C-alpha cells in the first residue's frame, strides 16, 4: 500500500513540475506562407547548412514561434539574384519551406553566425581567393560587390539597440533598415528544403490547396500532407545544387 502511495506522489510531483512544458508542447503551431518577388538567396539565406530569415517579412519574424514552419511561394514574376525574371503563369510553386528551430535577436545573430555576414567579392570572386587581393593592389579594373550574406546589422558598442548596416548583396540600404529591424528577430531553421526559383517545386492541389496572399498562416494540422510529402521525398538542405548558387 505504501509503495502505491509513494508511486502516486511521484507521478503527482512530476505532473506539477512539468505542467508548463506539457502545455507548451500542446501549443498550436502554424505554417506561414507568403509570395516572393525576389529570390536572391538573401531572404531567406539557405547557405552554411542552416536557412535564416534575418531581413524582410518583419511580421513573420516578430510573431512566429519555434516549431512553426515558413514557406515562400512564387509570384507571377520572380527576380533571381542576377535580376533575371522568371514567370509563373500556371499557379504558385514552392521556392522553400523550413521549420523554425530557434529565434534570436539581431545582436545574438551577429555574434553567433559570423559565416552569415556579407563577404566582399571582386570580379565575382571572394576576396579570400587567390589572386583577388592582387588585382586590387595592382590597380587592375575590378568590380566590387557582396555575396548574399544576410547578417548585415552590426550592434553599436555601448549603445544598446542600435545597429550599423553593412554593405550587402541583398540590395538593402538605409531605407530598409527600420523595416528590417522592426521584425525584432532572426529565424533559424536547421531543417529546410530550398528549391530556389529556378527549380521551384510544383505542389499537387491534393497536398495543398490554399490560395497564397501576401501573408497567410495555417494551422500545421491542416497542412500535414504537404510537410509529410516534402520530408518523405527530399533531403533537408539546398535541394538542387548548381552554378547559380553562391556558397
Q: What is each residue range found by the language model?
A:
Residues 86-94, 108-114:
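Short acidic alpha-helical/loop segments enriched in Asp/Glu that coordinate divalent cations
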Residues 15-23, 107-247:
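Contiguous surface segments at macromolecular interaction interfaces
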Residues 73-87:
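Short, charged beta-turn/beta-strand-edge "cap" motif at the junction between a beta-strand
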Residues 67-69:
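Structural motif
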Residues 2-65, 75-78, 245-247:
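Compositionally biased, charged N-terminal/linker segments
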Residues 82-84, 93-102:
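Short beta-strand-centered aromatic/proline hotspots
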Residues 79, 103-108:
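Eukaryotic short linear interaction motifs
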Amino acid at each position: 500500500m505504501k509503495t502505491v502511495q509513494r508511486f502516486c506522489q511521484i507521478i503527482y510531483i512530476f505532473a506539477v513540475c512539468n505542467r508548463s512544458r506539457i502545455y507548451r508542447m500542446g501549443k498550436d503551431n502554424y505554417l506561414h506562407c507568403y509570395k516572393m518577388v525576389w529570390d536572391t538567396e538573401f531572404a531567406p539565406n539557405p547557405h552554411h547548412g542552416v536557412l535564416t530569415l534575418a531581413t524582410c517579412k518583419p511580421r513573420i519574424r516578430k510573431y512566429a514561434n519555434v516549431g512553426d514552419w515558413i514557406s515562400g511561394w512564387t509570384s507571377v514574376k520572380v527576380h533571381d539574384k542576377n535580376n533575371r525574371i522568371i514567370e509563373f503563369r500556371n499557379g504558385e510553386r514552392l521556392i522553400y519551406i523550413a521549420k523554425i528551430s530557434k529565434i534570436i535577436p539581431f545582436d545574438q545573430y551577429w555574434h553567433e553566425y559570423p559565416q552569415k555576414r556579407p563577404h566582399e567579392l571582386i570580379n565575382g570572386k571572394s576576396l579570400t581567393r587567390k589572386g583577388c587581393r592582387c588585382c586590387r593592389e595592382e590597380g587592375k579594373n575590378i568590380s566590387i560587390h557582396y555575396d548574399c550574406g544576410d547578417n548585415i546589422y552590426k550592434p553599436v558598442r555601448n549603445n544598446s539597440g542600435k545597429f550599423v548596416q553593412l554593405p550587402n548583396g541583398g540590395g538593402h540600404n538605409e531605407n530598409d533598415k527600420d523595416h528590417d529591424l522592426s521584425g525584432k528577430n532572426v529565424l533559424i531553421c536547421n531543417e529546410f528544403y530550398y528549391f530556389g526559383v529556378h527549380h521551384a517545386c510544383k505542389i499537387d492541389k491534393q497536398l495543398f490547396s490554399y490560395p497564397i496572399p501576401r501573408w497567410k498562416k495555417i494551422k500545421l494540422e491542416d497542412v500535414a500532407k504537404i510537410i509529410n510529402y516534402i520530408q518523405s521525398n527530399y533531403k533537408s538542405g539546398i535541394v538542387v545544387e548548381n552554378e547559380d548558387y553562391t556558397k
